[in-house]
From Swiss-Prot:
It is an enzyme of class 7 (translocase). One of its GO terms (biological process) is ATP synthesis coupled electron transport. It is a multi-pass membrane protein. It catalyses: a quinone + NADH + 5 H(+)(in) = a quinol + NAD(+) + 4 H(+)(out). It is found in: Cell inner membrane. NCBIfam families: NDH_I_N, PRK05777.1-5. It holds the Pfam family Proton_antipo_M. This is NADH-quinone oxidoreductase subunit N. Keywords: Cell inner membrane, Cell membrane, Membrane, NAD, Quinone, Translocase, Transmembrane, Transmembrane helix, Transport, Ubiquinone.
């Protein structure tokens, strides 16, 4: 712990993306205070510029040899840099999609943008955290920002209710996570991930030490499973996705998943990989439950945000399944799936926002009726997105599922793979409901696209990218594998 006192300023360049973003938050907040409400566009462009420069700084650190600084609490490695670039890109896209929605729902305010930047800062700390304390600090910065974002539409009772549910359940999950961390710290004597890894790999551990580590592991897995939205810790997901403003749902469903995945890797792969035999069984149960419940309950939903919430739970199950194999290729397959999920989810919620207009919010599957007749290009884009989510070849959603199942079979869990395939087939049905609504159901209502050209352009690129990555998945899979 004394290492925390030794603060070497010559190493600050390693945390330059975080330092720049923190400075940008302060500057944007100050500038926004003096801007008239008619000039909030300036704040929007400032945060986009801040995200772009932060992403550029992180990109310049890709392929840099691993460096651990600040007394072992902060790490620069390839995974951290790549994830930060993806987080900046995904947040920029999410903000482009959200701009029209924020204007029409009177949420185009400086505090919204600052909260987004604060949550991104928390995620960056989580991605580079290399001690239990740093990881928890990043998680709380993220969580507190998200609580406020969900409740930012103060006049909406469902948004306030969703924020309260998320806050209460999040506080319980944070307590469980902290309790698990305290047990690991108590038995290993260190908060540092490297020290914990050395202790856990010690073959001379007695039964008492092994028991305490296992108990700590259980609480850690429960805490992280809640943040990911895995069954049975998923209760907040449907309510938050449905109750929060759609722009917030878009953000919550995508970028924080990258940070939660990174936290999972730091604690369980970097720190407790030698205990894989213990935590892999937990992951297997959680992943199967998530895939099963997410696939079945989504069939009963008519609200598209709620349906996509259960779809997210199912996707989280697939991501966790990649960890069961316990190999670098398995972890790489999980990372690939996670990045693909973010790409698909951005596009799906982007389509929902695209169809929103003043005084009317798209939230039912039936609202997509006749989309092909009135906006055939965007019906085609939605078709690509939905088929990819369903795992139809040759789209990227198919390859992400295939790589995960390949690793599960390679690890000898053939029965698990068969069960997962069955539920994947079941899940295709609720995706087909949207396609049926767009192409085969008639409506008297005329669908008009009110969104600006930049949103339409970025959304089209997003959907085409899903198709392109599916046709040429090798580069992205190699990138994911290079992280481990």
């Amino acid at each position: 712990m004394n290492n925390f006192i030794e603060f070497d300023t010559s190493s600050l360049w390693i945390a330059l993306p975080e330092i720049f973003l923190l400075s940008a938050i302060v500057i944007v907040l100050l500038i926004d205070l003096f801007l008239d409400k008619n000039f909030k566009q300036v704040t929007y462009y400032l945060i986009q510029l801040s995200l772009f420069i932060t992403g550029l700084l992180a990109f310049n650190l890709i392929d840099h040899p691993q460096i651990i600084i600040f007394g072992g609490s902060f790490v620069l490695d390839n995974m951290a840099s790549v994830f930060k670039v993806f987080m900046m890109a995904a947040t920029m896209v999410a903000m482009v999609y959200s701009r029209h929605y924020l204007r029409t729902h009177s949420l185009f305010r400086g505090e919204y943008f600052v909260l987004v930047l604060l949550s991104v800062l928390g995620m960056m700390v989580m991605v580079s955290g290399y001690s239990l304390l740093t990881l928890y600090l990043g998680l709380e910065i993220l969580s507190l920002s998200l609580y406020a974002l969900i409740a930012i539409a103060r006049e909406r009772a469902d948004a306030i209710e969703a924020a309260l549910k998320y806050f209460v359940l999040g506080a319980i999950a944070s307590g469980l996570l902290l309790y698990g961390m305290s047990m690991i710290y108590g038995i290993s004597g260190s908060l540092n991930i490297n020290d914990i890894a050395s202790f856990a790999s010690n073959t001379n551990l007695d039964s008492r030490e092994t028991l305490i580590i296992n108990f700590g592991l259980v609480f850690l897995v429960i805490g992280i499973a809640f943040k990911l939205g895995a069954v049975p810790f998923h209760m907040w997901v449907p309510d938050v996705y449905q109750g929060a403003p759609t722009s917030v749902t878009l953000f919550i469903s995508t970028v924080p998943k990258i940070a939660a995945f990174a936290m999972l890797v730091r604690i369980l792969v970097d720190g407790l990989d030698s205990m894989h035999a213990y935590w892999s069984d937990l992951f297997m149960v959680l992943s199967i439950l998530s895939i099963a419940l997410g696939s079945v309950v989504a069939l009963m939903q008519s609200n598209i945000k709620r349906m996509l919430a259960y779809s997210t739970i199912s996707h989280v199950g697939f991501i966790m399944l990649g960890f069961v194999a316990g190999t670098p290729i398995g972890y790489g397959a999980a990372a690939f799936y996670m990045l693909v999920y973010v790409l698909m989810s951005l596009a799906a919620f982007g389509m929902i926002i695209l169809l929103n207009k003043q005084g009317f919010e798209i939230d039912q599957i039936s609202d997509f009726k006749g989309l092909n007749k009135h906006a055939p290009w965007f019906a085609l884009m939605m078709l690509i997105i939905i088929l990819s989510m369903a795992g139809v070849p040759p789209l990227v959603g198919f390859y992400s599922k295939f790589f995960i199942l390949q690793q599960v079979v390679s690890a000898g869990f053939i029965t698990i793979a068969v069960i997962v395939v069955i539920f994947a087939v079941i899940s295709a049905y609720y995706y087909l409901q949207i396609i049926k609504s767009m192409y085969f159901d008639e409506t008297d209502k005329k669908i008009t696209i009110y969104a600006s050209i930049d949103i339409q352009l970025v959304l089209s690129i997003n959907a085409i990218l899903i198709l392109a990555v599916g046709l040429f998945p090798d580069f992205w899979m190699k990138l994911a594998l290079s992280l481990f």
